[in-house]
Amino acid sequence: MYVAIEGVDTCGKSTQIQLLKAYYPQAVFTKEPGGSIIGEHIRDLVLFAPKKYGFTLDERAELMLFLADRAQHYAQVLLPHKDKLIISDRSVISGIAYAKSIDIAQSIALNDFVLRGMLPDLVVILELDEKSLKERIESKSHDNIESRGISYMLEIQKCFKNVVTQMNLKYIVLDATQDKERICAQIREHINILV
């Protein structure tokens, strides 16, 4: 079973991944981008290109880099562990949502090509209201994506639901302002139903 934890930056995805590790020690935990060796380099390039390398990526170049990472992630992580519980910090859903200026049908087709049809069995979307998102974003330094602003992040948050609906995937939306243990319990409840 393949579970994707989704949400905008600062919503608590990484926190939930850490909490879930205690409950599912046999599971394979991964992340996108960066779940493979090449993915770490791609992630660094996309997130820090303006500050570290002095240029901004074209949106199509960014999409293609994420697709390359996703293809490698499929080959190195998803396919070899397809019979195990896989829990991922982000997935194809983020890839499509963040490429919102690209036609969604085209983006879905490109991602389906690199994933060979292997999609999450459950997508957990951690959602923040504008006030909470603003507070969390202001309390940390920004990478290239986060520096696009609150309005951009809220648009992306809406895109997550649109993407899972378009792809006909099973998903739940959880209020990310709740206590982290409560959120973890809700995620576990849904995983345990499907495992």
UniProtKB/Swiss-Prot annotation:
The keyword Transferase applies. PROSITE patterns: THYMIDYLATE_KINASE. Its EC number is 2.7.4.9. It comes from the Bacteria. Keywords: ATP-binding, Kinase, Nucleotide biosynthesis, Nucleotide-binding, Transferase. ATP binds at G7, V8, D9, T10, C11, G12, K13, S14. Pfam families: Thymidylate_kin (PF02223). GO terms for cellular component: cytosol. GO terms for molecular function: ATP binding; dTMP kinase activity. It catalyses: dTMP + ATP = dTDP + ADP. InterPro entries: P-loop_NTPase, Thymidylate_kin-like_dom, Thymidylate_kinase. GO terms for biological process: dTDP biosynthetic process; dTTP biosynthetic process; dUDP biosynthetic process. Belongs to the thymidylate kinase family. NCBIfam families: DTMP_kinase. Phosphorylation of dTMP to form dTDP in both de novo and salvage pathways of dTTP synthesis. This is Thymidylate kinase. It comes from Helicobacter hepaticus (strain ATCC 51449 / 3B1).
